[in-house]
Amino acid sequence: MEFSVKSGSPEKQRSACIVVGVFEPRRLSPIAEQLDKISDGYISALLRRGELEGKVGQSLLLHHVPNILSERILLIGCGKERELDERQYKQVIQKTINALNETGSMEAVCFLTELHVKGRNTYWKVRQAVETAKETLYTFDQLKSNKVELRRPLRKMVFNVPTRRELTSGERAIQHGLAIAAGIKAAKDLGNMPPNICNAAYLASQARQLADTYSQNTITRVIGEEQMKELGMNAYLAVGQGSQNESLMSVIEYKGDPNPENRPIVLVGKGLTFDSGGISIKPADSMDEMKYDMCGAATVYGVMRMAAELALPLNIIGVLAGCENMVDGRAYRPGDVLTTMSGQTVEVLNTDAEGRLVLCDTLTYVERYEPDVVIDVATLTGACVIALGHHITGLMANHNPLAHELLSASEQSGDRAWRLPLTDEFQEQLESNFADMANIGGRPGGAITAGCFLSRFTRKYSWAHLDIAGTAWRSGKAKGATGRPVALLSQFLLNRAGQNDVE
């Protein structure tokens, strides 16, 4: 879909459809009031007859309104005016896109970006409208033989901004929104791909394609099992040794900083393309969803795509830690003791706590880049789902300023995170009689002890950990990858690049 911004009066629009808001109870927004005045009270008369209350989710399509040049006016319920927050705003945009597609309108001028949203400026409203529109229109039908296509899909959306001074900000919002939405789509496509197709080799092929697309400043290197053995990445290798698919670590290097020697931001993504649990096998119920255990790697891939598309003036390294945890005669066992790349030893008490074993060696590997910061993203623990549910990502960090940056980016983007503690009391739960540490610390504080485990491999740099086990995908009828936290990390990078236009 094509997006653009303009600043104009509603009565002068000749678009196929004009979109304006209505508040509860039956109150016209300022733009709707202008159209009502021109139409000699036609719209307000409809509201008085009870055609539309103005609740969020309601809509009413009007045809050939008197004295209006546009063929149609779409009235969208926005709820109570004083309660219009960012969550309701996104719901309103989502309803708008669905309603426009149902009407068969191929283009529309949307005045909803002029609504007052608490604490949000025009840039935010336009960018979120773009991201939400793309999210609403997303489908994953690559593997279906019969694809459902709309008769006349919406092709062009124009967002109106209050003044001409805001056109530049609106244009930048569209540019950023499209890049972030493309990153989210890329992450969702990877996450939704079945594990018989999307294995570590597939992740590597996608990483190589990304480098080919943005070859001016992006390269990809793929590290296989032989090189991992030479590096001493025994924990990473142990997880994958029960699989017939080779473990591959894909390293995407993007150099956009005018000074290529500036220390990079490193993003590490857990890429378990399928997690059976290994010898500590998972229950059969919903095991199919363990294809989503690579959503951390998918997130990193999507964020790297966004950064390259916007040519951000940063040096960024994205690592996709691809692997598969399967049951086999060669699989690693509970009771095994592994020597990690760092030299620390780990007693395996549960083979289903495998993500941290892949990550610990990857986090040691990235020391060679002398990073400014390292952020890992992983569907790491069911305990984080219990703690924070499916709406908020868990955040842990060994560096307060980095944690605050990420929390700020989460608020700005609406891709929420919440910080959990990393304290010595939790470290004690990882003690082992036979190795430097165990790979699990018991049920209490399971998300935190997983973070504590990783923290033992990140002492040489500033580090943060995002546990996305609850936010990376949805179950049930709407099953599918969410693309989170691409938006959060994209905002973090935009802030780092000095391109923070969000209030």
Curated annotation (Swiss-Prot):
Broad class of where this protein is predominantly found: cytoplasm
Classify the source by domain of life: Bacteria
Q: Where does Mn(2+) 2 bind?
A: 270, 275, 293, 354
Q: Where in the cell is it found?
A: Cytoplasm
One MF term in the entry's GO annotations: metalloaminopeptidase activity
UniProt: Mn(2+) 1 binding residues: 275, 352, 354
Which GO cellular component terms, listed alphabetically, does the Swiss-Prot or TrEMBL entry include? cytoplasm
Cofactor binding annotation: Binds 2 manganese ions per subunit.
Q: Which Gene3D superfamilies match?
A: Leucine Aminopeptidase, subunit E, domain 1, Zn peptidases
Name the UniProt record assigns to this protein: Probable cytosol aminopeptidase
Organism equals Pectobacterium atrosepticum (strain SCRI 1043 / ATCC BAA-672)
